[in-house]
Amino acid sequence: MTDHYPSPRALLDRYDLRAKKSWGQNFLGDEAVLDDIARLAAPRAGDAVLELGAGLGHLTARLLARGARVAAVERDRDMVRVLRGELGDRITLLEADAARLDYADLAARFGAAAAAGEGPRLAVVGNLPYHLTSPILFSILDQVAHVSRAVFLLQREVAERLAAPPASRDWGVLSVLLQREADVSVERIVPPGAFWPPPKVASAVLCALFRPPADAVADPARFRRLVKAGFGQRRKTLRNALGSAKLADPARLEAAFAAAGVDPGRRGETLTLAEWAALERTLG
């Protein structure tokens, strides 16, 4: 099936379409990259995969060729027409906003139990436009119990920030939140020429394998607020950044710094994941 799947340019011509720049549409056509992403998302035949933004169906076809069960999310009606025309009933097509999905419902409908006693989970895969990367990642983190892995094609700079080591220049809010929940790695760099039309910057394949959280926190929602506040004003010390966010009164903040062993004169980007978690626990 994949040997004869038309190129992005051929499909756009067949359906008299053009890539929508306002939607961030750059269609991946490189067969080696498509194969790598499909292998990472669906290592075994029968795996349940949720594809976000299926587009023209190139990755979808690769996933089907590996024996995956694919539910494809797409809200562009032109792309829906292509997917129905090329792949028909071989996929479950969901016309929905990829940033507003109910993963519990989707996992119950399409997922498979990862281990005895666990609820059904999904692998999530997609070529994400820049403007949707953060909303989609936050949505997944809010519902992480229903996701086993995520494999995304992202702008290279974004992927490298998400996989950045603690206390590095690229360490940020989503780095902390994602790495607390998953083992995160950049699997390969993808040049602009792998797409049609080619984007202006390089991309990268990011893989996140979800697992039990690395460091316990008392209140996950408060942990997120704490990390966002700590990185919100990078030039400020933690004492000033967290004080401005009014997460606690000054005396309680100082006591938390002391109990966690964190110098309040440091800046947020210098803290490790374990230090962020310790600081949140001591605020309790």
From Swiss-Prot:
Residues that bind S-adenosyl-L-methionine: 26, 28, 53, 74, 97, 127
Subcellular locations according to the entry: Cytoplasm
Keywords in alphabetical order: Cytoplasm, Methyltransferase, RNA-binding, rRNA processing, S-adenosyl-L-methionine, Transferase
UniProt key word rRNA processing: yes
SMART domains: rADc (SM00650)
EC number(s) on file: 2.1.1.182
HAMAP family xref list: 16SrRNA_methyltr_A
The name this protein goes by in its record: Ribosomal RNA small subunit methyltransferase A
Species of provenance: Anaeromyxobacter sp. (strain K)
Lineage summary: Bacteria, Pseudomonadati, Myxococcota, Myxococcia, Myxococcales
